[in-house]
Design a protein with these regions (language model features):
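C-terminal auxiliary extensions adjacent to catalytic cores
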Residues: 2-34, 38-46, 72, 147, ...
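FAD-binding core of FAD-dependent oxidoreductases
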Residues: 53-75, 82-105, 133-155, 164, ...
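Acidic, glycine-rich active-site loops and adjacent beta-strand->loop/helix elements
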Residues: 59, 85-86, 105-106, 126, ...
């Protein structure tokens, strides 16, 4: 049964990700009332002729142009048309759903003043997987993405459903809905705020939270194969370093490797291991710490009002506030930090891959080939990992520093939160592939071990899951299919179950 998440006060990043993956969204009565109350304030502002940005004025550099009441609905409509200028491949279904969920959450705070029927139409589209086609590029913050969503509400634009594209008008008709006629402020609210960034950022933090466990599992398997020493993840020496993430990684490794006879065989054979093994708690732990910090920022932003202007007061005493809550500076910085952390996690995984396949250090058949020389084995898949790590370094350049000036000097500082979140997701794609390569190599290395000593129970379990998906690499064959199979395993399952205790 598909779960339903009821929006009462705020949505968390976990909830946004769940909705993007298919959970249904509903409004509580309190949330509905907040939306109704805020709209009554906007109507009062319009009735009294109180000037409010984007309500009865132009936008951007045209903010001082007063718009007559008869033209305010046209302003809302025209904003969607003029701002629908995104380019590039459309966002995926999950990304679009995350943005829409974050958008609805922003309106439900009760400071935007958009009508309830607009929000309910967004929910109907989202819950029925009738998702607007959003060009992925062309936004320094949010405008073009939001406009693509808004077009569908008025019967324009396009939607994607069951792999097919339909017109916005047909999408609404399929749900028994009619195109909306937007009122004052609604066009601006639909393109405004940080939902694009918070939606994508919610996906990023949840995806990295999933992959850090797989990274620990991959490292544990590499530890066994390479005869690593156990002191670097022992509880007492790790306690000397103050980091929640580091302590968690140490605990995970101790649990994953408990009872490993294979690892016990290597005890004391080296004074210390190379950093790609010895520093796993420190690097993986730092990534976990960065993830916790980024998640805190994303959840804080989801709990915040990011519309401009915001409305408050009451119909008897309406107030409108022009501020910069739509600026996503905190999100941009957080996503840049998360992107760098994910790139670092991929980098240390690639170094472990090299040690698994490199005959100079592995103690295993060269490049994990069963017939070295005639067969190249895992030689070039390590090059693939190195290429992805190099790409990550380029992607990890901070988007939040890109700057720029738009809208006739009115928007003269840009924080690029949405591009920062988008490139963090691109880095996570590469990280997932690199981890899949390490896990595939680690399973191959286990099969080629000369020792008959047994693996830890948990690494044995992970090995069996890998082998259920991909067989031993006996003769050279195209490896990209194997890696894709392991990527699917990483996407769809957890590294271990809660009952296993890591």
């Amino acid at each position: 049964m598909v779960p339903t998440i009821t929006l009462d006060t705020v949505l968390t990043s976990d909830a946004i990700a769940a909705i993007a993956e298919g959970a249904k969204l509903a409004l509580s009565e309190k949330a509905r009332q907040r939306i109704l109350d805020a709209r009554a304030i906007v109507d009062a502002l319009v009735d009294r002729g109180i000037r409010g940005y984007g309500i009865n004025t132009g936008v951007g550099a045209l903010c001082d142009v007063v718009i007559d009441r008869e033209e305010q609905a046209s302003l809302s409509r025209n904003l969607l048309f003029s701002h629908s200028c995104g380019v590039g491949e459309p966002l995926g279904r999950v990304e679009t759903g995350a943005i829409m969920a974050a958008q609805i959450a922003n309106f439900a705070h009760g400071y935007s003043g958009i009508r309830l029927e607009v929000v309910e139409t967004l929910i109907a589209l989202l819950n029925n997987d009738m998702l607007p086609v959003i060009p992925s590029r062309g936004s320094v913050g949010y405008l073009t993405h939001g406009a693509a969503i808004g077009l569908v509400l008025i019967g324009s634009g396009e939607c994607s459903h069951d792999g097919k594209q339909v017109s916005g008008a047909d999408a609404l008709a399929a749900l028994g809905l009619k195109p909306l006629v937007l009122q004052a402020k609604e066009g601006l609210s639909l393109i405004n705020g940080t939902p694009c960034a918070t939606g994508l950022a919610s996906l990023a933090v949840n995806r990295l939270a999933h992959l850090v466990d797989w990274a620990d599992a991959a490292a544990a398997m590499s530890y066994e194969n390479l005869g690593a020493q156990t002191d670097p993840f022992a509880e007492m020496p790790l306690s000397l370093r103050k980091s929640d993430g580091l302590q968690q990684v140490g605990k995970n490794l101790r649990t994953l490797l408990a009872g490993s006879a294979l690892l016990a065989e290597s005890a004391g054979k080296r004074t210390q291991d190379p950093l790609s093994l010895r520093a796993v708690p420190h690097v993986h732990g730092a990534v976990r710490d960065a993830l916790a910090e980024a998640r805190a920022v994303v959840d804080r932003e989801l709990a915040s009002v990011t519309d401009n202007p915001a409305v408050s007061g009451s119909p008897a005493d309406p107030k409108v506030h022009s501020q910069a809550h739509a600026v996503g500076a905190a999100l941009g910085l957080a996503m840049d930090h998360l992107a760098t952390a994910a790139a670092e996690l991929a980098a240390i995984s690639e170094r472990r891959i090299d040690r698994l396949v490199n005959p100079l250090v592995s103690g295993l058949p060269a490049f994990l080939a069963s017939g070295s020389g005639v067969e190249s084995g895992f030689m070039i898949i390590q090059s693939t990992a190195a290429a992805l790590v190099a790409e990550n370094r380029r992607l990890a350049m901070p988007a939040s520093l890109d700057g720029g000036i738009t809208s006739g000097l009115q928007e003269d500082i840009l924080t690029h939160a949405t591009p920062a979140a988008a490139k963090a997701l691109a880095i996570l794609d590469n990280l997932e592939t690199v981890l899949a390569i390490e896990l595939t190599a680690a399973a191959q290395a286990h099969d080629l071990q000369s020792s008959k000593a047994t693996k830890a129970a948990m690494t044995q379990g992970i090995y069996e899951r890998l082998r259920h998906v991909v067989p031993f690499y006996r003769d050279d064959r195209p490896m990209n299919g194997d890696i894709q199979q392991i990527r699917t395993l990483l996407k769809t399952t957890t590294a271990w179950s809660e009952s296993e205790g890591a």
